Amino acid sequence: MLEHILSLGAYLFCIGIFGLITSRNMVRALMCLELIFNAVNINLITFSNSFDTQQAKGEIFAIFIIAIAAAEAAIGLAIVLAIYRNKNSTRIDQFNLLKW
Amino acid sequence: MELELDLSFFYKTTILPECVLIFCLISILILDLILKIKDKNVFFFISLVSLLLSIFILIFQLKEEPVISFLGNFQADNFNKIFRIFIALCSILCIPLSIDFIKCTKLAITEFLIFLLTATIGGMFLCGANDLITIFVSLECLSLCSYLLSGYTKKDVRSNEAVMKYLLIGGTSSSILAYGFSWLYGLSGGEFQLQKIADGLVSTEMYNSFGSLLALVFIIVGIGFKLSLVPFHQWTPDVYEGSPTPVVAFLSVASKIAGLALLVRLFNIVFPFLPNQWHSLLEISAICSMILGNLVAITQTSMKRMLAYSSISQIGYLMIGLVTGNFDGYTSMIVYLLFYIFMNLGTFACIILFGLRTGTDNIRDYSGLILKDPLLTFSLALCLLSLGGIPPLSGFFGKLYLFWCAWKTGLYFLVFIGLFTSVISIYYYLKIIKLLITTENKEVTSYVQSYTVSSFSLLSKNSIEVSIIICVIASIFLGIFMNPIINILQINLHLNTFTNI
């Protein structure tokens, strides 16, 4: 049972990384970031259920990660708004001012 | 219940420096809210005083024994305290740089100070964090504030682009780090404190397994992004070019100090069984950083981009001390870090001053600056030469000690690469200095012509110039007083059991 859930976590992690690399929209990239954090949460809660049923430190870490991911998403969306005001689009590939 | 009260009395002094900063933060917020103060310089004064106060508290605490407080979540030993002093020192030097910049660009001052102080607090907690939750939360406290700071000029499209890249890459790196932490948690059988994780890895006999190697790789990738080690450096030049320059100056030193402290503590405590693996991984990335950072810096045309690559190569030099892995290695790393703070912040201060007066940061536009402002030219040249490592300046002594320690432990290849790339770095630093000084065809660029010199009398200095002068004096003369600094460090670190592992 443990390895199935761990592979689910690894699968979600890979989807998140893949989505971050390929997605062309800022909002979609933020959603992929959330996906990676959720993969971490799945891992933590699984481990906590199997090894650490007394203190449940994994669940506590998961709560912290959820809160921080929310803060990060809030900052990300604020940046999306600022970008949209300046350029009228949120596509990542249109940002090519800064390069070599 | 009584026991907890007693313990909480003990806790107060361990995080007293951070508490001073938090108190200052709250008082700035409240003062700005209730009093309609027109002269915002009061806030700079408050924050500078509180940072100085926290440095003094930390220096006085250096004599105390190492303690682990907050039920094992926070460790205060001398190694951490030195790094916490360095981070507070960076903020002290960076705040004067930002005063004039913010006044010229007409941004909000209070929010800038609050973000900067919060980033400082996050970095200071990160240096002393002793379990995975505290490490993650304080790391995010540092990086979330860095995102906000680097997107501070929100009307500027370049700043928008920089913060977008920084947020996506920083978020990815911290999630990768958290994934590595989750594996550590599982492999150690449900432990969170660093020392208990190491014990747990032994008791579950997982310390040499594939899983712990995987966790090690994930953690190196996550911290490598923060430190901008070479395979993970792609974001650095873009973020440095787009962000406001005082913010770049802060990021280029503070995040590196915090990241290095985290790297040293985490790997020495949690992975003492895999020293060969993490040493070789870090050695490869150090070599790549030195070579690629210095080679690419030659071709750059923007000053900030050039400094970004130069900072990538400097983190490679700092890694030499970490890879050396013994007491001398860590001491040399700390000494070089101290010199690096002054050299790098001095260079950035000169660039901020030039950028404010002319509005450009292209290397080409610096030509013939000596005709207009000899003192600025002189200080920029000295800081750059010190970064490159020219003999009488402090950067030379720092590098020499670093290479000597590595040579003694037998890392000949690393030292050879370091020496070779230092020569390359001297080439591109000298190219800028040549551009600054030579006036062969007697024509200066329009930017330099529009440069207006303030009177350099002793009374009417602006804050950037004060900061420049401190940094230049430190980066010239600190090298001469290197022996006392090393002695102080060795005496203080000697009491500490951690680096002797």
Curated annotation (Swiss-Prot), chain A:
Task: Enumerate the transmembrane spans.
Answer: 1-21, 29-49, 60-80
- Enzyme's top EC category: translocase
**InterPro entries associated with the record:** NADH_UbQ_OxRdtase_chain4L/K, NUOK/Mnh_C1-like
Q: Where in the cell is it found?
A: Plastid, Chloroplast thylakoid membrane
| Reaction equations catalysed | a plastoquinone + NADH + (n+1) H(+)(in) = a plastoquinol + NAD(+) + n H(+)(out); a plastoquinone + NADPH + (n+1) H(+)(in) = a plastoquinol + NADP(+) + n H(+)(out)
The GO terms this record gives for MF are:
oxidoreductase activity, acting on NAD(P)H, quinone or similar compound as acceptor; quinone binding
Q: What's its job?
A: NDH shuttles electrons from NAD(P)H:plastoquinone, via FMN and iron-sulfur (Fe-S) centers, to quinones in the photosynthetic chain and possibly in a chloroplast respiratory chain. The immediate electron acceptor for the enzyme in this species is believed to be plastoquinone. Couples the redox reaction to proton translocation, and thus conserves the redox energy in a proton gradient.
Q: What is the name attached to this protein's record?
A: NAD(P)H-quinone oxidoreductase subunit 4L, chloroplastic
Swiss-Prot record, chain B:
Which Pfam family is one of this chain's hits? Ndh2_N
Per its UniProt entry, which superkingdom is the organism in?
A: Eukaryota
Q: Which reaction does it catalyse?
A: a plastoquinone + NADH + (n+1) H(+)(in) = a plastoquinol + NAD(+) + n H(+)(out); a plastoquinone + NADPH + (n+1) H(+)(in) = a plastoquinol + NADP(+) + n H(+)(out)
Chief subcellular location equals plastid
Q: Which GO terms describe its biological process?
A: ATP synthesis coupled electron transport; photosynthesis, light reaction
For the keyword NAD, the answer is yes
* Enzyme Commission no: 7.1.1.-
A single Gene Ontology MF term assigned here is: quinone binding
Membrane spanning stretches: 15-35, 42-62, 82-102, 107-127, 132-152, 167-187, 210-230, 244-264, 278-298, 307-327, 334-354, 378-398, 410-430, 466-486
For this record, an example GO cellular component is:
chloroplast thylakoid membrane
Question: Which compartments does it reside in?
Answer: Plastid, Chloroplast thylakoid membrane
NCBIfam families, alphabetized: NDH_I_N, PRK02504.1
Q: How does it assemble?
A: NDH is composed of at least 16 different subunits, 5 of which are encoded in the nucleus.
Q: What does this protein do?
A: NDH shuttles electrons from NAD(P)H:plastoquinone, via FMN and iron-sulfur (Fe-S) centers, to quinones in the photosynthetic chain and possibly in a chloroplast respiratory chain. The immediate electron acceptor for the enzyme in this species is believed to be plastoquinone. Couples the redox reaction to proton translocation, and thus conserves the redox energy in a proton gradient.
Describe the family membership recorded for this protein in Swiss-Prot or TrEMBL: Belongs to the complex I subunit 2 family.
**Name of the protein in question:** NAD(P)H-quinone oxidoreductase subunit 2, chloroplastic
Lineage of producing organism: Eukaryota, Viridiplantae, Streptophyta, Embryophyta, Bryophyta
